[in-house]
């Protein structure tokens, strides 16, 4: 079982290059099922979640080659059931349902796994597919959807769910007629998916707004597409710089995707400048308290909540964070308390009373973003932190430890009983 040894590291300096967006890569990998022609994807991060999605494709009959580029060919699909043991590992396995029904008239997915951060039901996905004419049955932990030909429909999402928006966009791309998704998610990753689908020959417009219109076509073609940079990885590095009073340039980013995080870090006292594809963060010795409510994009991202909470444990004053997207997303709090943080939880609200310092401790990462928060806390703390559960970190960050070593951070990956 691998773990990190992290020694408090302040005043880091250097540049960190951001990898491709995990949350773009996963739906776009699923979308390749919409064509029998080969698709070539650039800037795909080498992550555990990506590997699981590719394993699922291979089990369905796809030919996959993953080196510098990712090439996928889906001309010999011979299985329409997503394997349960793989689906259990990743929530995004449900994104195969829309493409399978659209191209092969049927798909079967087990109820998916991934990070256990509260109730993330598939109801909105299934409601949309039913409106498009699919027959959907839920039985013994599996969902089966069938339709001879999906039909365009008007779909109003009760909540701007990213996964439901993506699944329905993909399904609608090969449907007969026009589909309109209202109250659609507006995340940059949705825009990236639209761009990929349109390169393939789909007719999708409106991504990035809350109304997306898709006019179905008969078939789609293979294309080459470059994935956008990962805004959550970028935001994580920005918070790390602020927490460790470091001066870091984060490159290969789209600054407009980071506006909510930049605004809150400025409020907390960090100095931030940005240019075409970079953001520079200089952390200051005094961290100011900040109040935050996580919301769907363009609000403050729930995927950045654990990281900024770690920063605010060191603020001079009291901060309040309201989790507006998921319940059960405060698993990092108990671990931060072990390091000396003063945090009170009330349902979906965390009240964080800043302390003068955190102290290294043995902690466990229970999910992906909690892992990132604990890395930040470990680097900001005095002494050594031992972080277990880093397989959760590897699901969404490509070589985070190596990237941080390059700017001078003392972070070391070890196996099992190995000592620092």
Curated annotation (Swiss-Prot):
GO terms for cellular component: cytoplasm. GO terms for biological process: cell division; cell wall organization; peptidoglycan biosynthetic process; regulation of cell shape; UDP-N-acetylgalactosamine biosynthetic process. It is found in: Cytoplasm. The modification 2-(S-cysteinyl)pyruvic acid O-phosphothioketal is found at residue 115. Gene3D superfamilies: Enolpyruvate transferase domain. Keywords: Cell cycle, Cell division, Cell shape, Cell wall biogenesis/degradation, Cytoplasm, Peptidoglycan synthesis, Pyruvate, Transferase. Pathway: Cell wall biogenesis; peptidoglycan biosynthesis. Its EC number is 2.5.1.7. The active site is at 115 (proton donor). The keyword Cytoplasm applies. It catalyses: phosphoenolpyruvate + UDP-N-acetyl-alpha-D-glucosamine = UDP-N-acetyl-3-O-(1-carboxyvinyl)-alpha-D-glucosamine + phosphate. SUPFAM superfamilies: EPT/RTPC-like. GO terms for molecular function: UDP-N-acetylglucosamine 1-carboxyvinyltransferase activity. Belongs to the EPSP synthase family. MurA subfamily. Cell wall formation. Adds enolpyruvyl to UDP-N-acetylglucosamine. HAMAP family: MurA (MF_00111). This is UDP-N-acetylglucosamine 1-carboxyvinyltransferase 1. It comes from Carboxydothermus hydrogenoformans (strain ATCC BAA-161 / DSM 6008 / Z-2901). The gene is murA1.
């Amino acid at each position: 079982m691998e773990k990190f040894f992290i020694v408090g590291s302040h005043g880091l300096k250097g540049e960190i290059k951001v990898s491709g967006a995990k949350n773009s890569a996963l739906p776009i990998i699923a979308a390749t099922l919409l064509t029998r022609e080969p698709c070539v994807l650039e800037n795909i991060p080498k992550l555990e979640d990506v590997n699981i999605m590719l394993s699922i494709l291979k089990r369905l009959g796809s030919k996959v080659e993953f080196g510098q580029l990712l090439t996928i060919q889906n001309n010999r699909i011979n299985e329409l059931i997503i394997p349960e043991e793989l689906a259990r590992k990743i929530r995004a396995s449900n994104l195969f349902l829309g493409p399978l029904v659209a191209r092969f008239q049927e798909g079967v997915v087990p109820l998916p796994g991934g990070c256990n951060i509260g109730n993330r039901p598939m109801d909105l996905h299934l409601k949309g597919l039913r409106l498009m004419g699919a027959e959907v049955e839920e039985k013994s932990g599996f969902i089966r959807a069938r339709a001879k030909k999906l039909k365009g429909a008007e779909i109003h999402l009760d909540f701007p769910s990213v996964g439901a928006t993506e699944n329905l966009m993909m399904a609608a791309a090969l449907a007969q007629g026009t589909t309109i998704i209202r109250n659609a998610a507006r995340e940059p990753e949705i825009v990236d998916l639209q761009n990929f689908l349109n390169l393939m020959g789909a007719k999708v417009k409106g991504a990035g707004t809350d109304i997306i219109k898709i006019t179905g076509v008969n078939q789609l073609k293979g294309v080459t597409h470059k994935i956008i940079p990962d805004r959550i990885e970028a935001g994580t590095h920005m918070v790390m710089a602020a927490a460790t009073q470091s001066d870091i340039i984060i490159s290969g980013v789209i600054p407009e995707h980071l506006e909510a995080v930049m605004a809150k870090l400025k409020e907390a006292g960090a100095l931030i400048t940005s240019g075409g594809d970079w953001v520079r963060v200089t952390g200051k010795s005094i961290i100011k308290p900040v109040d935050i409510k996580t919301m769907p994009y363009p609000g403050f991202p729930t995927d950045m909540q654990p990281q900024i909470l770690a920063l605010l444990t060191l603020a001079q004053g009291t901060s309040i964070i309201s989790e507006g997207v998921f319940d059960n997303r405060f698993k990092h709090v108990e671990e931060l308390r072990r390091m000396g943080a003063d945090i009170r939880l009330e349902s979906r609200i965390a009240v964080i009373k800043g302390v003068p310092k955190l102290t290294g401790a043995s902690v466990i990462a229970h999910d992906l973003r909690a892992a990132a928060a604990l890395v930040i806390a470990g680097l900001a703390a005095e002494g050594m932190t031992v972080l277990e559960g880093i397989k959760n970190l590897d699901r969404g960050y490509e070589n985070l430890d190596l990237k941080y070593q390059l700017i001078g951070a003392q972070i070391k990956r070890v196996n099992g009983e190995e000592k620092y």
